[in-house]
UniProtKB/Swiss-Prot annotation:
Protein name stated in the entry: Aspartate--tRNA(Asp/Asn) ligase
Reaction catalysis annotation: tRNA(Asx) + L-aspartate + ATP = L-aspartyl-tRNA(Asx) + AMP + diphosphate
CDD domains membership: AspRS_core, EcAspRS_like_N
Keyword Ligase: yes
Organism: Paraburkholderia phytofirmans (strain DSM 17436 / LMG 22146 / PsJN) (Burkholderia phytofirmans)
Record family assignment: Belongs to the class-II aminoacyl-tRNA synthetase family. Type 1 subfamily.
EC annotation from Swiss-Prot or TrEMBL: 6.1.1.23
UniProt GO molecular function: aspartate-tRNA ligase activity; aspartate-tRNA(Asn) ligase activity; ATP binding; nucleic acid binding
Amino acid sequence: MSMRSQYCGLVTEELLGQSVSLCGWVSRRRDHGGVIFIDLRDREGLVQVVCDPDRAEMFKAAEGVRNEFCLQIKGVVRGRPEGTTNAALKSGKIEVLCHELIVLNPSITPPFQLDDDNLSETTRLTHRVLDLRRPQMQHNLRLRYRVAIEARKYLDSLGFIDIETPMLTKSTPEGARDYLVPSRTNPGQFFALPQSPQLFKQLLMVANFDRYYQIVKCFRDEDLRADRQPEFTQIDCETSFLSEQEIRDLFEDMIRHVFKETIGVTLDEKFPVMLYSEAMRRFGSDKPDLRVKLEFTDLTDAVRDVDFKVFSTPANTKDGRVAAIRVPKGGELSRGDIDSYTEFVRIYGAKGLAWIKVNEVAKGRDGLQSPIVKNLHDEAVKAIIERTGAQDGDIIFFAADRAKVVNDSLGALRLKIGHSEFGKANGLVETGWKPLWVVDFPMFEYDEEDNRYVAAHHPFTSPKDEHLEYLETDPARCLAKAYDMVLNGWEIGGGSVRIHREEVQSKVFRALKINAEEAQAKFGFLLDALQYGAPPHGGIAFGLDRIVTMMAGADSIRDVIAFPKTQRAQCLLTQAPSEVDERQLRELHIRLRQPEPKV
């Protein structure tokens, strides 16, 4: 018999009476009146092993076994006694009567119990190998594998070719910071780890590969958040000779396929499409969570001439905005709740949170409860009630500031209220999956510090055909052929139709204040390639980490990555990054200059 005949979790009634050889780890050991029970665990689950004292040598070995010992068990499958079955396990109707027990490797006492759900993330990441033994982590990483496999199956079936692109490439610092790799053989020069395979996949389209994909690591040296890592994985795709609509349809079908085959979820037959401008107007976000049934009401024009300066000042400012959200039955919220929300929006730059409780609509301003009503004229009060659709028992929250602050703060408040216990109890949030496309993004954003336009997506995104003239006359009006796939408030994929003509790409560089000499130095290889009959092409990249996080219901993408970094971009398991010795630095022609200590 080989070392292992079956996985522990796959031993079922079909094997009754048969001899098996199992390998795994001790999940739990119990001594019941001279009989020892061992729950043996492997990646497929648990099986109960019974060690009785009839076999003295085996029983003696079982007495010395402790949690996380690695064992080989040989025995016979038998039914569990009546009343001792466990419906929660695949193997819950059987047990294995142990004939031979071999300790393949003992274990020191683990620093925590694997079934402890209250571990700190620091503990989990420091002892990641043990953390990965936990059933939830096993489930998450196997789910990740299945998502990748199903994406590959779909793309393979449509003629996409998996092509690897370089990991050591050229630094083109547009956007996030690059991770740099010094070149020993070219002193003073550096490679960069790719933030995406963007330019290489475009070159593959010029090279007539037609359809490309890659499940690929990408790197960005940026401040981390719950949904960011310095190294992350993309399902990266590019295709030639398809329109924007055809590209969206193709990859919408891919996501539907992946969800159906991996977690049995049927997504909408057709994802809704929303303009970027509409998303910002209604939700203050370009990745709206459509499960939350709260929307913005714009009031900027209605409060321009009120005495309340908190409203009228931003309402008369070029980039100002005044908006509100009506919360049905929000009149039930206590003053403590309102104060808590006020502190919450300050995180996003808001100076405060104005509110009106609607006690009785029919009474007009007399039916409203708020410290701000006295500062609003009748026309403004009427507009607020009518536009928000306020009813008795509602509360209206307001934000008034620069548009970005209003969108960020009121958008965050919308989600917080919607997903709160109050929101769930009052039907303000739906369950399930709400996908959509957000399209027609601005081509450029204005950087006040540098006094120039920067690419909102990246500088290789094509402008809409009817906006080509704006590249040289009015870049702020220029919209892009860009699209994001959004699911439950997360951007899970982003892409665009690319620029395939050299003269258009050069115009975009000029709009970005990248002169011809700089463009040739940084992107000459692309500009040259575009002159050799480059085909119309476009693509998309999906965040594999984000998709799996959502499917698994995990709190962080660190729960679906085997060996993630912390929010300080450190690996607590290996203690990376680490110092290197002086000899290595000399070989790389590098001298360290430590930052000045902060006072």
